[in-house]
Amino acid sequence: MEGGTLTTELLKYFGCSSEIASASAFVQQRGKLNAMAFSSLFDLFVRNTDSYKLYKGFRLLAADGSEIQIPINPGDPDSYYPGSNGQSPYNLLHLTAMYDLLQRTYTDADLCGKKKANERAVLCSMVDRSSLDNVLLIADRGYENYNLMAHIQEKGWSFLIRIQDVSNSRGIAAGLDLPDSQEFDLFVDLSLTTKQTNELKKLCKNRNQYKHLHKDFDYLPKTNRKHDPIVFYNLPFRIVRFKISEDSYETVVTNLHVTTFPPQELKKLYNMRWGIETSFRELKYTVGLLHFHAKKVEHIYQEVFARLIMYNFTELVTSPVIIQKADCKYAYKANFSVAVHVCRQFFLGNVSPPDVEALIRKHVSPIRPGRSRPRKMTAKHAVSFIYRVA
């Protein structure tokens, strides 16, 4: 569905038939569906449309999360915030996703109330249940975590995760002895443990070789008795700091080999992570994720996963459309907004497959690499049921 009222969308789909079901009847029927039915459809769609591209032998996946404000529902304690200091109450869901940067499709997604959100734990679960091989997982500072790095290592994947910079007193970098230079590439071979003894305290003086973890770690014992032997988990990685502008730097950790992936290559790869940020914007505003047609959270789950399927379908249809014109400065790609509309018309039976590709090829936009602008952080709100496009 698009951004109109539920009645408008039903009239649009059924062709203004006088026998059309009412909005109330539609809501009652959708209530009979399992809340996770569309999640299963999304997983099935991903498995059956998995034709990926590789970069230096790796499949590039980005992980990130995004908050979704939904219609106010005090009856859902996992997402409801009463507001404070004069702020109106609101409900938030949290979407965690893995996104293929070269195929430009979502490979996995998890949705829950904001109060229950734990991005790192969710991503660990996504890594564990994935059937993919030769993956390089790229993530931002929210995923700086030894436990997550271990899950990725155990899976046989590679990781590239941005961490808090060396100037920050917290985080992975703060617990290591690093070079004094502005830029560096240091290999660290850490032995992690959750046990605390006098012997271990002496070992931990070598901060680049031994590390005591205060939190639970999935690959170490949950409890440690006094006479139990010390158990270590080995986690080798590089910590790399590189310049991104005249006066700013980024620090990342990775288990990629330095010969194939020197610092400049890591910088390029991490910059590619922006593709998942762009996908969230298109998912919300082009595909219409913010235009819900329900208040019940289980119905909203259906709509979120339906739009993820729609996003993936549109990207798969448009991905072959890259046009290089000899007399033009830029290569051209499909206009995603037009492509979404054409794909919707295809599902409605108004456009045949040959015309879908022809229409998409007719509406293209130039590819302008290297552009950037300051990111404006503003509050996002669910679109009211009252103010909808007719």
Give the role of each language-model region.
Residues 81:
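Extracytosolic and intramembrane catalytic regions of membrane-associated proteins
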